[in-house]
């Protein structure tokens, strides 16, 4: 499984319906699980992003599909980054010639 960091902002619609956010989070977890992944962490944040989630998924295509499906609801905008573990980082650096 690959790890992904998902940076999330509410849209105007998302802020207007913020009380429904916990239900949307539960739905997002189910959508990720249906794609073969798992949300491992979720944070409400202060600053540039409203929320941050950490998820594991089998591949980039699965995550792209999930993020597009969740974005279709209109309540959030996301920026997703593929993350590498420290061990993966060490392997990548070791391959530099």
Provide a role label for each language-model segment.
Residues 1-97:
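A compositional/biophysical signature of low hydrophobicity enriched in polar/charged and small residues
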């Amino acid at each position: 499984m690959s790890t992904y960091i998902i940076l999330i902002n509410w849209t105007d619609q998302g802020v207007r319906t913020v009380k429904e956010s916990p239900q949307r989070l539960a739905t997002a977890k189910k959508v990720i699980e249906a794609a073969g992944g798992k949300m491992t962490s979720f944070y409400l944040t202060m600053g540039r992003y409203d929320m941050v989630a950490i998820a594991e998924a089998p591949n980039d295509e699965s995550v792209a599909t999930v993020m597009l499906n969740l974005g279709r609801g209109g309540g959030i905008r996301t920026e997703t980054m593929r993350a590498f573990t420290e061990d993966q980082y060490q392997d990548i650096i070791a391959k530099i010639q």
